[in-house]
Amino acid sequence: MRLDFENAYADVISFDCGTEVKEYHAMIHVAESRLPYAKQLEAVINAYHALLSKWPDTQAVFKRYFLSDAANQADDVIVADVTDCAKSIIQQAPLDGTKIALWVYLMSNVQTSLTKSGLYQVSHGEFRHLYNASAHNLAANSEYQMRLLFNEYIMQLAEEGCTLSENCIRTWLFVNDIDLNYGGVVRARNQVFFTQGLTVHTHFIASTGIGGRQQDPNVLSQMDNYAIAGIRPEQIHYLYAPTHLNRTSDYGVSFERGTYIDYADRRHVFISGTASINNKGEIMFPKDVEKQTRRIWENVEALLKEADCTYDNVVEMVVYLRDVADYEVVRALYEERFPDKPFVIVNAPVCRPGWLVEMECMALKAVNNPDLPMF
């Protein structure tokens, strides 16, 4: 559903399977691109508060701000938004011509707090959902930065009685000048994962590795992540779609194409950043953004199908474009195919230059698994 506010609007999907926790995904956009940044930020923050007043029993559990110029804008977001949740702030310019967009994930009837480890905790029932965002450091290069990020995260998880291999469900890796610095990020992740027992013979973690920068140009790698304390191994399932995609380890990287988590009452599906690839690892339809977009849809559909889901179950999408000149074509395709979905299209180069476009998404489905704990 679309909700209109002063100088902003939100596309929202709510999920209610009849149990205690309702979930909401909202993509908040600025309606008037000619406004100065301060007014655009104000419009987004006011729209967020209007959503909270519409659903007074909800709390934000995760936010991502997409900015057009982090060096000039990020500090203002930090001052304006004092919400007690994980806040991801990244320069990935919204391609509708505005300076800021916000993806916010809300839940009802949960308790939120900041843990001693520095992770944001969302508690309900047996589980503690642990979110972290905008993690960064100033090590010498992208490889050292990413290795330190993962090692610090492993220590944070240990403080929560968790491990990377058993509890981490999703990561986002943002790489400043990805064409130059992605190789270092890949090496660091491969090395850390090997030490943590994450191999081609066990499993990896659903992830997006994408271009994005911070306000400090010396930050070459930023990480957001999500883990679940209390999750059981039998609740976690990995998605492969081998008819459409190959294993990422075939071309030297280490992430899962998708993951779904089952509870007694619902299924959470996390689709990693997905590009126009085939099951040999080749780029499909080089230099044709429309055909690449349609191939992505097909690939994501195949992954969703393995989780017994369709696009009807998708609750949010982020679309990454390498070339701003492709925006009108891609926007028209998405608006025609997904008129009622919360999505945002941002300027962010994909990890391989030949991939012009990439998308990630999350899906939610009501299920009945009486042998599993409730969400």
Indicate residue ranges for each PLM-predicted region.
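N-terminal presequence-like segments and the immediate start of the first folded domain
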Residues: 1-312, 321-375
